[in-house]
UniProtKB/Swiss-Prot annotation:
It comes from the Bacteria. Residues 31-51 bind DNA. It is an enzyme of class 3 (hydrolase). Its EC number is 3.4.21.88. It catalyses: Hydrolysis of Ala-|-Gly bond in repressor LexA. The active site is at residues 128, 165. Pfam families: LexA_DNA_bind, Peptidase_S24. One of its GO terms (biological process) is proteolysis. This is LexA repressor. Represses a number of genes involved in the response to DNA damage (SOS response), including recA and lexA. In the presence of single-stranded DNA, RecA interacts with LexA causing an autocatalytic cleavage which disrupts the DNA-binding part of LexA, leading to derepression of the SOS regulon and eventually DNA repair. The gene is lexA. HAMAP family: LexA.
Length: 204
C-alpha cells in the first residue's frame, strides 16, 4: 500500500506541474523538465507515470509532436498549439527548413503569432539588437520572406552568415542597422533577405 501511495503522489505532482506550466506559459513542460521538478532522474520513469495518467483519462499525448500533452478535463489546455522549427544554421542556396538544419521545435499557443505560414526560429547570439529589446539567447520567431521594407527587422545572409538587423535600402546600397548605439551599421551592395521578425520568445 505504501508503494501505491507514493505512486499516486508522484502522479499528482506531475499532473499539477503540467497544469501550472500550461496556465503560466501556455504550453506543457518537456519530460526532462518534469524529471527536474519531481526529482526523478529517469525519463522512462516519467513516461511511465504519463502513460498511467493517460490510461486514467486525465491527459492525452501525441507521440509525433514534442511537448504534446493535453489535460483532457482542464479547459486551459484546449488552446490550439503550433510547432515551430528551431533552425541551427542558415546557408545560402540551401532550403532553410531542410531536415538537417532543424535542431529542435518550440511549441507555443497559436494565438501568440499572427501569421502561421513558413515560420522558423533562430537563436540570437550577441548584443547587436538590445535597444530593440532583443537579447543574447532569445529565440527570434521569423516569418520566411524575401521582401522587406525600410525599418523592418530582418534576417539577412551576408557571405553565408545570417544576421538579424534593421533593414534600410539607400540608393545603391543596403544598410543593415544594429539596435545598439555602440555598433556600426553594415553597409553592403546587396544581401539576401530570408525572413522578417514576427516575435521574440524568451526562456526565464
Amino acid at each position: 500500500m505504501a508503494t501505491d501511495k507514493i505512486t499516486r503522489d508522484v502522479q499528482s505532482e506531475i499532473y499539477e506541474f503540467i497544469r501550472q506550466e500550461v496556465l503560466d506559459k501556455g504550453y506543457p513542460p518537456s519530460v526532462r523538465e518534469i524529471c527536474a521538478k519531481v526529482g526523478l532522474s529517469s525519463t522512462s520513469t516519467v513516461h511511465g507515470h504519463l502513460s498511467r495518467l493517460e490510461k486514467k483519462g486525465l491527459i492525452r499525448r501525441d507521440p509525433t509532436k514534442p511537448r504534446a500533452i493535453e489535460l483532457i478535463k482542464d479547459p486551459i489546455s484546449k488552446r490550439e498549439m503550433i510547432d515551430i522549427p528551431i533552425v541551427g544554421k542558415v546557408q545560402a542556396g540551401q532550403p532553410i527548413l531542410a531536415v538537417e538544419n532543424i535542431d529542435d521545435y518550440l511549441t507555443i499557443p497559436l494565438n501568440f503569432v499572427r501569421n502561421t505560414n513558413d515560420l522558423f526560429i533562430l537563436k540570437i547570439s550577441g548584443n547587436s539588437m538590445i535597444e530593440a529589446g532583443i537579447y543574447d539567447g532569445d529565440l527570434a520567431i521569423i516569418e520566411k520572406t524575401n521582401y522587406a521594407q525600410n525599418g523592418d527587422i530582418v534576417v539577412a545572409l551576408i557571405e553565408n552568415d545570417a544576421t538579424i538587423k534593421r533593414f534600410f535600402k539607400e540608393k545603391d546600397k543596403i544598410r543593415l542597422q544594429p539596435e545598439n548605439h555602440t555598433m556600426d551599421p553594415i553597409i553592403v551592395d546587396n544581401c539576401e533577405v530570408i525572413g522578417k521578425l514576427a516575435g521574440i520568445y524568451r526562456r526565464y
